[in-house]
């Protein structure tokens, strides 16, 4: 099978959907079976009506048993399983309310003995059972987050002090989180075929089975700290749920790319402002997804959006094998012509080769 060439995709923030179309993203959007099916179908239809000329959405989108929010990429089931309160919103991603656990409470923290009995896991499994009973199969997944992201939500700002002064404590915390992530992932991936399309749906264009670890918070620690205290857990998760990829939305992905390579990464989501050439040098055979800046896109003219896209492609340089372009979480106010300029710029570089986008919308 020929690999797609220069896949490109976008994800719009819930506020964009809410302001344009009145769609809401309360808890029922995530867990009510009928609402899941209806809203995912409707979102695909709306994408086609607005951007069908770019390949987005589906004209006659079928009803499908998609278990997670793969058109917006949010969800915090691991945090919820480990006791965080989640605040759902009509026009935004869910908010995690940090637990700010004490040192004693962290030492007492354990992987739930019967994880399927936790309220959030019961809700997810019930959703999966009902959809599979109706359709005979399942698609999609629920974002599992990363060890560092969940650790901050559980411990709060004291986590950063612990990384220096209480490394035995963070070792315990990291182990509990990694095992919890795995316990969720192993119950999802065998039934849906994916476990991280909800982190960045661009992978549906080429390898939907990649397990992406979303290391959003690595911007706040050094590569040395990551290597010494977190890398082993990410690498372990990659061995349990292969193949392994990483999301790094910060502007310093190049500093961590050699460590990701050491962990066996086959995919890296490269944050805007990162040294793309250095990332490619560290991961010569991996897929790289080059991220545009959604804040810049919100006010960009078509010309500015095209220039930013050109800049990413130039920073990588030819050939663009195993290279993708995406812009994630674009908010209300982003101009349609800026989105079109992004896609048309990539299309000039792609030529007549297949982008994989229609495959992506069939799978995700």
Specify the residue positions occupied by each region the protein language model found.
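Active-site loop segments of alpha/beta catalytic cores
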Residues: 1-36, 42, 49-50, 67-70, ...
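A gly/proline- and charged-residue-enriched helix-loop-helix capping module
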Residues: 90-126
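Membrane helical hairpin/interfacial module
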Residues: 35-86
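A generic structural signal for short, solvent-exposed coil/turn residues
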Residues: 2, 59-60, 89, 100, ...
């Amino acid at each position: 099978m020929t690999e797609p060439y220069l896949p490109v995709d976008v994800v719009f923030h819930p506020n964009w959907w809410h302001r344009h179309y009145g769609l809401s993203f309360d808890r029922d959007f995530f867990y009510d079976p009928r609402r899941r099916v209806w809203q995912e179908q409707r979102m695909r239809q709306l994408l086609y009506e607005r951007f069908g000329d770019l390949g987005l959405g589906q004209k006659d989108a079928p009803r499908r048993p998609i278990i997670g929010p793969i058109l917006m990429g949010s969800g915090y089931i691991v945090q919820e399983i480990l006791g965080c309160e989640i605040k759902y919103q009509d026009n935004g991603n869910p908010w995690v309310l940090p637990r700010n656990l004490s040192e004693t409470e962290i030492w007492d923290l354990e992987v739930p003995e019967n994880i399927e009995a936790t309220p959030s896991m019961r809700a997810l499994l019930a959703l999966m059972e009902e959809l599979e009973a109706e359709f005979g199969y399942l698609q999609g997944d629920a974002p599992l987050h990363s060890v560092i992201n969940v650790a901050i939500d559980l411990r709060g700002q004291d986590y950063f002090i612990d990384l220096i002064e209480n490394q035995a404590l963070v070792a315990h915390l990291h182990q509990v989180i990694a095992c919890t992530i795995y316990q969720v992932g192993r119950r999802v991936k065998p039934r849906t075929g994916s476990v991280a399309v909800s982190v960045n749906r661009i992978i549906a264009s080429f390898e939907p089975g990649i397990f992406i670890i979303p290391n959003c918070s690595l911007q706040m620690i050094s590569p040395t700290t990551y290597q010494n205290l977190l890398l082993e857990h990410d690498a372990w998760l990659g061995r349990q749920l292969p193949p392994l990829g990483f999301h790094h939305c910060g502007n310093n992905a190049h500093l961590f790319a050699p460590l990701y390579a050491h962990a066996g990464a086959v995919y890296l989501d490269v944050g805007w402002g990162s040294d793309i050439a250095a990332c490619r040098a560290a991961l010569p055979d991996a897929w790289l997804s080059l991220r545009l800046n959604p804040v810049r896109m919100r006010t960009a003219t078509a010309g500015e959006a095209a220039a930013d896209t050109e800049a990413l492609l130039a920073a990588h340089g030819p050939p663009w094998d195993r290279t993708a372009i995406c812009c994630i979480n674009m908010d209300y106010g982003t101009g349609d012509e800026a989105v079109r300029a992004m896609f048309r710029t990539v299309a000039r570089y792609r030529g007549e080769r297949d982008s994989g986008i229609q495959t992506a919308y069939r799978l995700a």
